[in-house]
Amino acid sequence: MAKRVTIGDVAARAGVSTATVSRVLNGGVATEATATRVWDAVTRLEYTPNALTRGIFAGRSNALGVVIRDLSSPFYLGLLRGIDDVAAANDSLVMVANTFRNVDHEVDLVRMMDEHRVRGLVTTTDERTDSRTRHMAENGTPCVIVARTAQDPPSGLHSVSLDHVGAGRLMAMHLIECGRSSIGVVTSGGRPSQIERVAGLRQAFTQRGRSLAEEAVTVATTEEEVDRAVGTLLARADDRRRPLDALACTAGRLTVAVHTALTARGITIPDDIAFLTMDDFSWAPALGISVITQPSYQMGRRAAELVVDPPAEPVSIVFEPALVARRSCGERANV
């Protein structure tokens, strides 16, 4: 096995000390002749600097830490692309960890990111990790919470989120405009984004002189629970003698499961029931599924920019949702 070239080999080739090589590689002061000899030795020996050693001397690595709750959501793919593009442009490595929605694991992963002295942290974790994230920010590591707003953030703690109430309002207005009147909602639980989207749905219905009954909203925290949730909504509507003519899903990661639950029951979209969900994905156009989109790529870029060029004061950035109308709500029939 070939021996890895070391900084000592470069120093010997250039005829200088290892301290001089380190200084040149890190942009320190050196004469032009010395720098030329060092870089020539680096090139000829194909030397790769040790990022770990650099991090030790700098007191921080050059990696940008990202803690994701659930990579099954289409939202996170665009988010990661945006983060990676900014990191690459700033000579940073992206260190990604997926928590699988396990809060204890989330806390551990944020702690480990801190222990690895990442350049900064972008996190989509539960509120119960905020004390650890806040601790990192207070100790000089820029942190960005994505998908919700940080409460009373200290310097160094920022947030990038969506207008979730606006997303819910867009859902309600589109379904109403498509002539739907008996609407059920599948949401994924108590996350601020889910609560605010349902609140937006209610607001829009109220403004149109309608209401969204409590029993018209059901929670499914996992894909396995979705079939039961859809069945419950259909049964409740039938009991009220107002069969559902629309179903809204406020969590993009549950889209496939909700769509499957409807079609498995022989329900035709949109003839029997309109279907509207969050977050666009690769096969949505082929199936004609209408969606409320959030600009995940732009959100990822902005989050990473807050890490690589951190502002002095906390920043909270809110992006606007958009409707992509296809045909799953009966749009063509209403043209």
Where are these regions (language model features)?
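N-terminal helix-turn-helix/winged-helix DNA-binding helices
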Residues: M1-T6, T43-R81, A89-N90, F100-R101, ...
